[in-house]
């Protein structure tokens, strides 16, 4: 097995101290006001991530929930470390490392976070009759609880109409904390939070807190090299959940490439298998793909077609765990979504020639396919992939 998929060296340093430019980018993210949009008549809350983290941490500790540290995770952490990686960032993933051993710990965390939102309501709002359930319905986009032998964590995602959600994750234990090396970074925020509370002087190059980053991949410098050079690498790809396939294709569209042909084939087979294990039902696949397109291509809608074509190619080449009917069904779903986003982009008028295919397969009606669809004979976007620029009829 190649080096990118090999086990981490026990001596490889997983931590690194951030430079001054990186600390400045981190401070800008933590101090930027992020709106939390309310449903119905509830007002929009405006809060800085730094303030929200401090309030949540204080409230949890008052309730007896020990917070070991708070971290910035995901694409925002990658952006702080290397702002020109091509990944960008949308969600703010904030991890609270906590103890969730008690029988009521999950419920205590949820109520503590929801009650914190009261602090950010505009002045003049009567808070006395607002319950945690009301706040959940008004401001929470997603609520997740996982409690297994290896994983104990919960997630509260706060609503933002532009897709820039603040996601608060409360982790007691989590077996797999990353998918690829380029999204394996976590930045420990405790020193930044302490500095903002205690220092009367602003940060400068000669006077700023020491901030530490960690790569869950295992080797910080190797992961940074992958981020700078847009390399896709991972460890133990068989552990990656079904959503890893969607993230992998997103990286491909953004110009990232596997380190080697062997890595690519190994990763793709594992990820396709896991995708169909986690999402066996065609309707669940449709829902997942639509949500992914909506959440991860804000401001990049023109990339959705290229993304779906890439996903179609990977599934077509690397799926080995399905019956032929199931495989064709999934490929037809991806093809249908690709045509749909293409029509939304109003490209058909610019296409000089197109071919019309008829799809009489009986399962097509199950996911609201149109009977006819068109696909361009010539490629509409410059793309480095070698796959066909049209999608054949799947009967």
UniProtKB/Swiss-Prot annotation:
Its EC number is 2.7.7.19. Belongs to the TENT family. The keyword Transferase applies. InterPro entries: TET5. It is found in: Cytoplasm; Nucleus. It is an enzyme of class 2 (transferase). Catalyzes the transfer of one adenosine molecule from an ATP to an mRNA poly(A) tail bearing a 3'-OH terminal group in an ATP hydrolysis-dependent manner and participates in cytoplasmic polyadenylation. May be involved in maintaining the translation efficiency of at least some genes through preventing degradation of their mRNAs. Its main location: cytoplasm. GO terms for molecular function: poly(A) RNA polymerase activity. It catalyses: RNA(n) + ATP = RNA(n)-3'-adenine ribonucleotide + diphosphate. This is Terminal nucleotidyltransferase 5B. Pfam families: NTP_transf_7 (PF07984). It comes from the Eukaryota. It comes from Xenopus tropicalis. Keywords: Cytoplasm, Nucleus, Transferase. One of its GO terms (cellular component) is cytoplasm. GO terms for biological process: negative regulation of apoptotic process; negative regulation of cell cycle; negative regulation of cell population proliferation; positive regulation of translation. Transmembrane segments: none annotated.
């Amino acid at each position: 097995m190649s080096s990118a998929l090999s086990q981490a060296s026990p001596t490889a340093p997983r931590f690194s101290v951030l430079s001054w430019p990186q600390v400045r980018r981190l401070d800008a993210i933590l101090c930027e006001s992020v709106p939390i949009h309310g449903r119905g008549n509830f007002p929009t809350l405006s809060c800085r991530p730094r303030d929200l983290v401090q309030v949540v941490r204080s409230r949890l500790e008052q309730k007896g929930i020990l917070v070991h540290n708070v971290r910035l995770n995901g694409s925002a952490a990658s952006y702080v470390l290397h702002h020109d990686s091509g990944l960008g960032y949308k969600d703010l993933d904030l991890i609270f490392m906590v103890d969730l051993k008690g029988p009521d710990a999950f419920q205590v965390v949820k109520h503590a976070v929801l009650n914190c939102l009261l602090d950010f309501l505009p002045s003049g709002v009567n808070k006395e009759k607002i319950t945690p359930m009301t706040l959940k319905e008004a401001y929470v986009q997603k609520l997740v609880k996982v409690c297994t032998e290896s994983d104990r964590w919960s997630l509260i995602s706060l609503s933002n109409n532009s897709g820039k959600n603040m996601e608060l994750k409360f982790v007691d234990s989590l077996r797999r904390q990353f998918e690829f090396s380029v999204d394996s970074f976590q930045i420990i925020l405790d020193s930044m939070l302490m500095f903002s509370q205690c220092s009367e002087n602003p940060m400068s190059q000669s006077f700023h807190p020491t901030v530490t980053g960690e790569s869950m991949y295992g080797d910080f410098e190797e992961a940074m090299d992958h981020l700078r050079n847009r390399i896709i690498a991972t460890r133990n790809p068989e552990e990656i959940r079904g959503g890893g396939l969607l993230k992998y294709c997103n990286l491909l569209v953004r110009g990232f490439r596997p380190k080697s042909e062997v890595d690519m084939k190994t990763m793709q087979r594992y990820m396709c298998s896991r995708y169909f294990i986690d999402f066996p039902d065609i309707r669940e696949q449709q829902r997942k793909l639509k949500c992914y397109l909506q959440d991860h291509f804000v401001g990049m809608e023109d990339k959705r077609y290229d993304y779906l074509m890439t996903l179609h190619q990977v599934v077509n080449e690397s799926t080995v765990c399905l019956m032929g009917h199931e495989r064709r069904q999934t490929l037809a779903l991806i093809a249908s979504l690709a045509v749909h986003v293409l029509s939304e982009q109003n490209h058909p008028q610019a296409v000089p020639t197109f071919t019309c295919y008829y799809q009489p397969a009986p399962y097509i009606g199950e996911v609201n396919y149109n009977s006819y669809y068109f696909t361009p004979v010539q490629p509409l976007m410059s793309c480095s992939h070698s796959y066909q620029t049209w999608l054949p009829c799947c009967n």
